[in-house]
Amino acid sequence: MDIRAAEISAILKEQIKNFGKEAEVSEVGQVLSVGDGIARVYGLDNVQAGEMVEFPGGIRGMALNLESDNVGVVIFGADRDIKEGDVVKRTGAIVDVPVGPELLGRVVDALGNPIDGKGPIKAKERRRVDVKAPGIIPRKSVHEPMSTGLKAIDALIPVGRGQRELVIGDRQTGKTAIILDTFLNQKPIHDNGPDKDKLYCVYVAVGQKRSTVAQFVKVLEERGALEYSIVVAATASDPAPMQYLAPFAGCAMGEYFRDNGQHALIGYDDLSKQAVAYRQMSLLLRRPPGREAYPGDVFYLHSRLLERAAKLNDENGAGSLTALPVIETQGNDVSAFIPTNVISITDGQIFLETNLFYQGIRPAVNVGLSVSRVGSSAQIKAMKQVAGSIKGELAQYREMAAFAQFGSDLDAATQRLLNRGARLTELLKQPQFSPLKTEEQVAVIYAGVNGYLDKLAVNQVGKFEEGLLASLRTEHKDVLEGICNEKALTDDLKAKLKAAIDAFAKSFA
């Protein structure tokens, strides 16, 4: 067998030419111990705080505790398949999620992976989950209304675009229902409104039952609201790190719209469960516990999340991100640690009460304890004109109602006040899934504060309202359109509205 030198050298040259010049360098560590969703890893000397690391089998984790001799890693997934001595790789990337309009209409987990079975998400952009909130200079004070469609809120506790309004109450008081109705109320704007007014919705479910989240998504889908919404779900069966991360992931998705000159609304449901998940992680990482065994930085956990909701000024695109965080209280105790923290961070709270809920006053908003620190700058002029007096009348009614229990012989003025108050309270009730446009709310409240309900029996108020709205929508469209376009009750509009209500009141009697 003759060996041709030229041939061998040609083959060798060819092989050398194709030889991979780049060796893959990856910094690795070893698992020292693992359990309860936490791994202690030796090595990984240059790992960054919050960096993603990879375990065998594609399981991911996040480096949270950087200690002198090891790294504490929280695991996003089951820790059953991870054992002592396993090799852990750095990925070099801080935790990020896909963002953009491609996510609208989808249900994703805390890392942005789709969990709705509708195929992969082809997002063009990714963002870090934990970024710094906008500073003072890029912001602008809140001045545009974010309409919820609920009379009790839009009239008395108005929420503006870029505001953070806490929804707080015991379990089963209708907190999620307020967020759901607010999402549904954006449908008319998405169908017919200008692009600049459209409000994209993000719902973050933390530690909830899967059936509850499925029900929420089903309602959005049936009512055509899923097409402008994103649902981020970290349910009760998900690991604590996912429940901790979900609000930050949802916030990053909402910030995409805020930073592109659009408007977004995010509901965190609920932050009490996020705090519990964070407490679990912190205690397992052996961080020192503080009040109620929460770690010392649980205030910072919520403040850095909620500070990212902002209204940006015109130089920065004039976008906004409005936050509706939810907190669940135990036995109406708003003085517990997490509720007081979040109340002090947010720009007001909507306080829901169990006994109001069981009295049939739904939404069960306690108007006396609820406030909006942005106030009437988040209302259109027409709403300010009619809602100004309803606040005062309801406050007087609550005060009088407390005294009226003792005395039987009340003077006529007090009796009148109590009658009016009872009817206004009835007027502010609203069934679920039936949000009203702002101009319709203005018309209804105008009828209430101008004495049209005083002669009616309390149980007739709802019927009167339904009939009045039906009459306005069919025969007096021009009045509603006028309020919508003018955004104020001019003398001319007031006269038209008064005539329309007078005509209806005659036929109703």
From Swiss-Prot:
E.C. number: 7.1.2.2
Binding site for ATP: 169-176
Lipid bilayer topology: Peripheral membrane protein
Subcellular location: Cell inner membrane
PROSITE patterns named among the record's database cross-references: ATPASE_ALPHA_BETA
Gene Ontology cellular-component terms listed: plasma membrane; proton-transporting ATP synthase complex
Keywords: ATP synthesis, ATP-binding, Cell inner membrane, Cell membrane, CF(1), Hydrogen ion transport, Ion transport, Membrane, Nucleotide-binding, Translocase, Transport
Residues carrying the site annotation Required for activity: 370
Keyword Nucleotide-binding: yes
Stretch forming the signal peptide: none
UniProt KW Nucleotidyltransferase keyword: no
Record Pfam families: ATP-synt_ab (PF00006), ATP-synt_ab_C (PF00306), ATP-synt_ab_N (PF02874)
EC class of the enzyme, as a word: translocase
Gene Ontology MF annotations: ADP binding; ATP binding; proton-transporting ATP synthase activity, rotational mechanism
Catalytically driven reaction(s): ATP + H2O + 4 H(+)(in) = ADP + phosphate + 5 H(+)(out)
Subunit structure comment from the entry: F-type ATPases have 2 components, CF(1) - the catalytic core - and CF(0) - the membrane proton channel. CF(1) has five subunits: alpha(3), beta(3), gamma(1), delta(1), epsilon(1). CF(0) has three main subunits: a(1), b(2) and c(9-12). The alpha and beta chains form an alternating ring which encloses part of the gamma chain. CF(1) is attached to CF(0) by a central stalk formed by the gamma and epsilon chains, while a peripheral stalk is formed by the delta and b chains.
Function: Produces ATP from ADP in the presence of a proton gradient across the membrane. The alpha chain is a regulatory subunit.
HAMAP family named in the record: ATP_synth_alpha_bact
Family per record: Belongs to the ATPase alpha/beta chains family.
The protein's name in its UniProt record: ATP synthase subunit alpha
Organism the protein comes from: Brucella melitensis biotype 2 (strain ATCC 23457)
Name of the gene encoding the protein in the UniProt record: atpA
